[in-house]
Design a protein with these regions (language model features):
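Bacterial N-terminal signal peptides that target proteins for export
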Residues: 1-10, 20
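Core of compact, soluble alpha-helical bundle domains
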Residues: 23-150
Length: 150
């Protein structure tokens, strides 16, 4: 029941953030002040992403999407991305989300499972709930580039 509530809440938040970003004509919102620090700066984000990719590989819902992935390279790219989104000094140098996910046949439920794994990882790392929500709001607009199958 709790997982269903969280998934629905998350889907609503993702939808609202995506609609808000489209209404403002922007790809992503500016990073809220203090978010980079709340995630432990680059070191904290790197530790979070190292744990996150291991959990993605271990979760039966998300594991098939990461069978052929280089987990250390994935963690590095995600670290760059979250560091940049959170207002840190990093620059994301990877491919676009659309290009990376275009041929993976990702459905909304797959995306929601990944977000649940991310939330569990952030909880395990002690990231405050408010900081988690601010980061998820920054990531939400990527949904339209990641979900490629109805």
């Amino acid at each position: 029941m709790k997982e269903t509530f969280i998934a629905r809440l998350l889907a609503t938040a993702i939808t609202l953030a995506a609609v808000n970003a489209q209404a403002q004509g922007t790809a992503a919102a500016a990073a809220p002040a203090g978010l980079y620090a709340a995630f432990g700066e680059r070191t904290g984000i790197a530790a979070l992403m190292d744990d996150f990719v291991l959990r993605l590989k271990a979760d039966k819902r998300t594991a098939p999407f990461f069978e052929k992935s280089n987990l250390s390279e994935l963690a590095r790219g995600l670290t760059e991305q979250l560091c940049m989104l959170s207002g840190g000094p990093c620059k994301y140098t990877g491919a676009s989300m659309k290009k990376v996910h275009d041929d993976l046949d990702i459905r909304r439920r797959d995306f929601n499972a990944l977000v649940e794994v991310l939330q569990d990882t952030m909880d395990a790392k002690g990231i405050p709930f408010s900081a988690q929500n601010r980061m998820l709001a920054l990531l939400a607009p990527m949904h339209r580039d990641v979900v490629t199958k109805p």
